[in-house]
Amino acid sequence: MRKMKMNKFNIDNLNLFYGENQALKQICLPIPNRQVTALIGPSGCGKSTLLRCLNRMNDLIEGVKIDGLLSMDGEDVYGNIDVAQLRIKVGMVFQKPNPFPMSIYENVAYGLRAQGIKDKKVLDGVVEQSLRGAALWDEVKDRLKSHAFSLSGGQQQRLCIARTIAMEPEVILMDEPTSALDPIATKKIEDLMESLKKDFTIVIVTHSMQQARRISDRTAFFLMGELVEHDDTHALFSNPRDDRTRGYVNGDFG
């Protein structure tokens, strides 16, 4: 039986420095399994930095120093682990759609081919399953050989989600995945997240408080590198404990 209330990640006294600049300050945050957790706050508050800690994307930035504990299923993410495998388990969808310059089919199959999977029946099955999972199959099933760039922006973003799903991750990180999309495409992505959380843990960075309220189960509010407050989303927006949270969700600053 699936244990919905277990935490996928536990973050304890996490600090991150870019050189001498401290971007995250003693962050303590549980991220529950198979729920949507939204990270909100004004620009530069540290929410995207924390998101990138979860799959060690910050390792790619020169001069980054991290201390504290970040565990996934009880295993130290910054311990002696295979980072490539971590990034398969913890997939990422970026702010702007970034399909590869190849066909729709090959975008989804790319990661599988990179792992040495060549069986066409296996590839066909995973491509269809992943596109269905991203609510895109019915729109593209008759043109899988078409170039990915022929898709609309919203379709391209769902293709990127399908590409992530194909690798069978446990977690999907989303860094403002709808900020470049129109309202109709945004609604499709939001509806998709509701269905995806049945199988995946989702952590999303969003500048839209309305979006956080619509889609997330838990919300964490960041300000100047600090985690000010985290709670059930309804509770955080309707009855915040901290005056800074109240000011932000009321639109007093942002």
Swiss-Prot record:
Binding of ATP: at which residues? G41, P42, S43, G44, C45, G46, K47, S48
Instruction: Note the SMART domains from the entry.
Output: AAA
Give the subcellular location: Cell inner membrane
Gene Ontology biological process terms, A to Z:
phosphate ion transmembrane transport
Q: Say which domain of life the source belongs to.
A: Bacteria
GO CC annotations, alphabetized: plasma membrane
InterPro entries membership? AAA+_ATPase (IPR003593), ABC_transporter-like_ATP-bd (IPR003439), ABC_transporter-like_CS (IPR017871), P-loop_NTPase (IPR027417), PstB-like (IPR005670)
According to the record's subunit comment, the protein's assembly and interactions are: The complex is composed of two ATP-binding proteins (PstB), two transmembrane proteins (PstC and PstA) and a solute-binding protein (PstS).
> Which NCBIfam families does this entry report, sorted A to Z?
3a0107s01c2
- What's the protein called, per UniProt? Phosphate import ATP-binding protein PstB 2
Q: Give the originating organism.
A: Photobacterium profundum (strain SS9)
